[in-house]
Amino acid sequence: SGVNLGQLYLPTQAAAATPTFSQYVEQETQVQRGAGEIHVALVCLRAPHLIDDETLDGIALTMAQLVRLDMQIVLVLNCEDEVVQKNESYREVYRRQGSRVVAALDRHNNEGARYIESALNVTNQESMPASRPKVMGTVELGVPKLITQPLKRGAIPVIPTMAYDTTCKVESVSVSAVMLALTRSLSGLAAVTGSPDKLLEDTSLDRIIMLDPLGGLPTETRQDQAHVFVNLEQEYDMIRDEIKSCGMNPQYLDTLSLVRDCLALLPPASSALLISPEEAAISSHHSRKESTIGITTRRQKNPLIHNLLTNKPLISSSLPVARLSSNGIIPSMSSESATRSTLVKRGMP
């Protein structure tokens, strides 16, 4: 099934129509984007059991739109909370939620999705050679083709936080270990344990996306109580202290720390987006719930699509809060849902 992107391509069309001095620009583009290079966004979906089917369907539509815009998706499934809450094995939990996610993605992405349990390995730290890079951790991408082959076709690999140890026994591993292992591999920093994967060499990890029910980072220093943009080099310590001193959910700090570790392995132009599932699905929800009595409404912008096209936050941190709803950027929101998406960068290029 095709995905109607509406006006999403207009910014890129306008840019293409702008006169440029093409000789220098084209040479620079060839250096930065090799022929056949696969651009990837690494997405972490936390607590899918808290996401209803309609919102999950909207997220899948947004992921399909990103693929249509030439940003391939690797999706990490984080069900740690549900495993703790329910009396069933983590493998059963992940397979149930993985089936939900894959079914939703299959409805919207032309090449569908693949649930992949066997891509990750747990390494033995004691036997690791001294030549291994210091960034190596206990989890690594053991079978790259299980991910790169679907990516080449435009399919979306869905990866649970599970890995096989040296005895071929599967075990649950932390989402941080999985995200860092995939960041290393997709950015070319992982050590090669076997024959190199040419497709892996051609991947470029451009974005980290954290889909979390908590949404973006809250703050008491802004009227709308939301961090719009975070420069980690300048603000990490301050935000960490604020989260601790104000008694905020410690998951915020866990997420921010994970994003910091991932971005430290990527080029300065890379960015991360912390966003709630509801915001990630906002454009599709809007299209379903448009009024049928002839009243036209402005289509709400999707933060993920906007970030892909601009590498900037959806709203300016200096924009007065009163203008957000009037501009159609953010719908009216209750105080409980005031936290919006947060764009995070390692520093300012």
Predicted regions and their residues:
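Nucleotide/pyrophosphate-binding catalytic subdomain
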Residues: 1-280, 329-349
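Conserved, well-ordered active-site substructure
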Residues: 227-230, 288-299
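Intrinsically disordered, low-complexity cytosolic loops and termini enriched
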Residues: 1, 291-292, 302, 326
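Glycine-centered secondary-structure boundary/capping sites
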Residues: 70, 154, 289, 301, ...
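Hydrophobic/aromatic interaction determinants used to assemble and anchor large protein complexes
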Residues: 9, 25, 140, 277, ...
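Intrinsic disorder at enzyme termini
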Residues: 304-331
